[in-house]
Curated annotation (Swiss-Prot):
Record's catalysed reaction(s): uridine(34) in tRNA + AH2 + O2 = 5-hydroxyuridine(34) in tRNA + A + H2O
Keywords: Oxidoreductase, tRNA processing
Rhodanese domain boundaries: 123-217
InterPro entries the UniProt entry points to: Rhodanese-like_dom, Rhodanese-like_dom_sf, TrhO, TRHO_N
Annotated protein name in UniProt: tRNA uridine(34) hydroxylase
Keyword set includes Transferase: no
GO molecular function annotation: oxidoreductase activity, acting on paired donors, with incorporation or reduction of molecular oxygen
Annotated source species: Shewanella sp. (strain MR-7)
Documented EC number(s): 1.14.-.-
Enzyme kind, highest EC tier: oxidoreductase
Gene responsible for this protein: trhO
GO BP term, example: tRNA modification
Native organism taxonomy: Bacteria, Pseudomonadati, Pseudomonadota, Gammaproteobacteria, Alteromonadales
Protein task: Catalyzes oxygen-dependent 5-hydroxyuridine (ho5U) modification at position 34 in tRNAs.
The family this protein is said to belong to: Belongs to the TrhO family.
Length: 333
């Protein structure tokens, strides 16, 4: 049975003093041995973390006791292994970066559509269905008949809208993303641009996969996630994709057979994009990873500090032994 609980959460809320939350939140996560990253900004909180069920329950309870963070939106999935290496709480300008000033989902946002009602909506021929995620995410899975804006980052989405969507022509627009947060901003942006009927999938793809049976589903493929699982299938279990440690792109087993694929160094997606300096750096990093594995040690993450401390203590013990031996020799002279 999977014993690691993965929790994706977010909430748009005015947090004028969000900086003061960082240290107590980080301390709470470290004490509970929760790993992953949470983002704090004046507009709210966002992130994905993982830990035991008790630890995640404690985190959600802690957040619920903070002014403004009550009833936070979250989705749970499960894994056999910890999908994160480190524990981080970062301070940001935005909890999801669109880069457009004045977009506030707290003031205006699209109409939420529950997973149970989503199929009927997107089956309407008058509805334009747009995937708000990045191209590499769309490539491994999306909803049937969804439009791929072919963006590399969410910052490019406003330009896609300006060039391809027209409020006078596209009367009904439905959008979706992984957990719902990008759609909060994308629907708010469309409403600001004059689109009247704008809908988005409440809880995102992950909530849809959780609540809709596969035989009734209009989802095709797997869903990319921003952790070491890379992607999840319809049962929210780790999917078939791996990840290139050089460019972080999802890769298939077939792509790993390519001559362009070198573990930790390159893949078909990045072989022509990385410089010789980067390649050398990636080769050295992979060498260090393999060396750590041979010693059964962590290469990155919070466990590295334990490894370093253990080595320091071992060296100190050897130094003390050497000092004692020298003292013994001098005493016998």
């Amino acid at each position: 049975m999977s014993n690691v609980v993965v929790c994706a959460l977010y909430k748009f809320v005015s947090l004028p003093h969000f900086e003061s939350l960082r240290e107590p939140l980080l301390s709470m996560m470290e004490q509970a041995e929760i790993k992953g990253t949470l983002l704090l900004a004046s507009e709210g909180i966002n992130g994905t973390v993982a830990g035991t069920q008790a630890a995640i329950d404690a985190l959600l309870a802690w957040l619920n006791n903070q002014n403004g963070l009550e009833n936070i939106v979250y989705k749970l999935s499960f894994d056999d292994e910890m999908p994160f290496y480190r524990t981080k709480v970062k301070l940001k300008k935005e909890i999801v970066t669109m880069g457009v000033e004045g977009i506030d989902p707290l003031k205006v946002v699209g109409t939420y559509v529950k997973p149970q009602d989503w199929n009927a909506l997107i089956s309407d021929p008058e509805v334009i269905l747009v995937d708000t995620r990045n191209d590499y995410e769309v490539q491994i899975g999306t909803f049937k008949n969804a439009i791929n804006p072919v963006t590399e980052t969410f910052r490019e989405f406003p330009d896609y809208v300006k060039q391809n969507l027209d409020p006078a022509k596209h009367k009904k627009v439905a959008m979706f993303c992984t957990g719902g947060i990008r759609c909060e901003k994308s629907t708010a942006y469309l409403k600001e641009q004059g689109f009247e009927e704008v809908y988005h999938l409440e809880g995102g793809i992950l909530k849809y996969l959780e609540e809709i049976k596969q035989e009734e589903s209009l989802w095709e493929g797997e869903c990319f996630v921003f952790d070491n699982r890379v992607a999840v299938d319809h049962d929210l279990k780790k999917g078939q994709y791996d990840q290139c440690n050089a460019c972080r792109m999802p890769i298939t087993e077939a792509e790993k057979l390519s001559l362009a694929y070198v573990q930790g160094v390159s893949c078909p997606h990045c072989i022509d994009k990385i410089s010789e300096e980067q390649r050398k750096r990636f080769v050295e990093r992979e060498r260090q990873v393999n060396l750590a594995k041979s010693r059964n040690e962590a290469h990155i993450g919070s466990d590295v500090n334990q490894v370093i401390e253990a080595r320091r203590q071992k060296k100190e013990a050897l130094r003390q032994q050497s000092v004692e031996k020298n003292k013994a020799k001098q005493a016998n002279v």
